[in-house]
């Protein structure tokens, strides 16, 4: 488990609660790595999210271990403790984390910030959110049929975005990408520009909260409440969770 990203590489920071990490997280990371020829996707469980004062269901150590199990053996996927809880119990802010990561990159290294559509649509609420795309260009996984107007409307105050026709990262241009990617440019009032990458039509009908409900046996199938065994069987059948993660949840008695 790496504490920091390797120097001189093309890296995407992928922060989140990972409570628990599921197949949707992995699908987003796979798509980003293939589309933009990333060397590494850094999965970084967050210690304390400012916008979730109620905290997470599982503790930080459990979420780190589940994430490690989820990415184990997958080339280019690593777990980072860069967003670990602070000794002061202060919130973890994405901008501060990205600035720290970028400072550690050797010359020639590139840092991106990877997120799903839900995170992007809440970006306006993040601390100093208008600065984030200029520290680490955004890679956003959108839902099928997501109108571009929704993306424009979600931009932090003072930012605009336009399509960057024909633009393609140099590393990606060497080979046809395995996943479609659309390129844009984000501009701020100071005249600065930053690339923005959209992974369109990435269908992921899954959420961590739904998984937690399933584990608790809280979903209804039209007949009655599912038993605990039936809920866990459904998780396995539908491949919502990597098997090692589900085994860990069972062993630790999480989300009951």
Q: Where are the regions that the model predicts?
A:
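Nucleotidyltransferase catalytic core that binds NTPs
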Residues: 1-256
């Amino acid at each position: 488990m790496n504490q920091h990203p390797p120097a001189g590489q093309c890296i995407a920071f992928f922060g989140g609660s990972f409570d628990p990490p599921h197949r949707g997280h992995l699908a987003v990371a796979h798509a980003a790595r293939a589309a933009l020829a990333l060397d590494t996707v850094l999965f970084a469980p967050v210690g304390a999210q400012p916008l979730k004062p109620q905290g997470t269901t599982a503790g930080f150590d459990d979420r780190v271990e589940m994430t490690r199990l989820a990415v184990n053996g997958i080339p280019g996927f690593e777990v980072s403790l860069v967003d670990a809880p602070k000794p002061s119990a202060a919130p973890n802010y994405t901008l501060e984390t990205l600035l720290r990561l970028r400072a550690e990159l050797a010359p020639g290294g590139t840092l991106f910030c990877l997120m799903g559509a839900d995170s992007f649509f809440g970006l306006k609420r993040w601390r100093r959110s208008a600065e984030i795309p200029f520290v680490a260009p955004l890679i956003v996984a959108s839902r099928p049929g997501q109108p571009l107007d929704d993306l424009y409307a979600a931009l932090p105050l003072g930012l605009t975005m336009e399509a960057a026709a024909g633009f393609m990262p140099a590393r990606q241009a060497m080979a046809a990408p395995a996943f479609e990617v659309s390129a844009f440019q984000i501009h701020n009032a100071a005249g600065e520009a930053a690339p923005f990458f959209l992974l369109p039509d990435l269908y992921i009908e899954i959420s961590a909260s739904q998984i937690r409900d399933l584990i608790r046996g809280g979903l209804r199938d039209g007949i009655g409440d599912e038993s605990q065994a039936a809920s866990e069987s459904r998780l396995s059948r539908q491949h919502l969770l990597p098997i090692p993660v589900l085994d860990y949840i069972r062993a630790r008695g999480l989300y009951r």
